[in-house]
């Protein structure tokens, strides 16, 4: 919310102000993804970049046994960017309880907790998140295919 506050303090926050949030550990985001995020944030108020889940997703409430296996065709893997009308994002965030704020894992969860719609933007499998050493090797392989020197 600091970014929204900064924009407001600068006198630039309007009903049409769009904020695009992105993980710096996703260096392969494409122009198309960013462009579509801005478009759908303007049209729908909020959007999340996703790719269809290719693996079966299992839910476990206790960490030892499967409690649910959702239909794969309904499952997506979240990526970034995530984009929003800034004023609406701030408004919804302010309405969250401390308990709700404590379970936030990403900005779209703010909307989901308040049953607000979030449009899906098609991501890209190469928009990987570099978190573990293996991810860095994958990123290097992606770069290796596009190096010009």
Show where each model-derived region lies.
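Residue-level signal for inorganic ion chemistry
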Residues: 3, 23, 52, 85, ...
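Conserved core of the sugar-phosphate nucleotidyltransferase
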Residues: 15, 28-121
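Short phosphate-binding loop-to-helix
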Residues: 1-15
